Amino acid sequence: MNNYTPPYKITSKILKLSTQISEELTKLQFTGVEKVNPILRKKNRIKTLAGTLEIEGNFLGEEKITAILDGKRVLGTVKELAEVQGAIKAYEKLDSYRYDELDDLLQAHKILMDEILTTAGSFRSVNVKVAEHIAPKPSIVNELMMNLFSWLKNSDEHMLLKSC
C-alpha cells in the first residue's frame, strides 16, 4: 500500500458545505427519493447529460438530447452525436461502477468514448495541456491513478470529501 494523499486542506467553508450537503442527503433519504415523478427523473437525466457534455464543448443541448433519447434523428456532427450516445450508455451503467476500482473508471471511459477515440478505455499516451495547466507525463499517469484509487479504497476520509 502506498502513502499517497491528494493535496487538499479541509477549511471551515468545506466543513460548512459538506454539513449542508449531508443534511440535504438525509432529507432525501427520509422523503423517499424513489417516489420522484418519472417525468421529473427524465428531465433531470437530460439536464445532467447536457451539463456533462457542455463541459467537454458539446452544445447539442437538452432539446436534441431529448430527441435522441426518444429515438429520433437529430442534426449534429458525427462526434457530437457519438458523445451523446456514449454519455447515455455510460450513465445507464452508473450504478454498476465502483468508485474505488480503477478498472471501472477505464470501463466507463471506454463506453463513453468508444465511438470517438481508438484508445478509449486506456490512459493517454501523449502529452496534453489544458489552458495553463500541463498534465503529468503519460509515462506516470498509470502510477498516479493507481495511487489515487488506492487512497480512495483505503482512506478513512468521509465519502463526500473523497468524491471531490
Regions found by a protein language model. Give the residues of each.
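FIC/Doc superfamily catalytic core
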Residues: 1-164
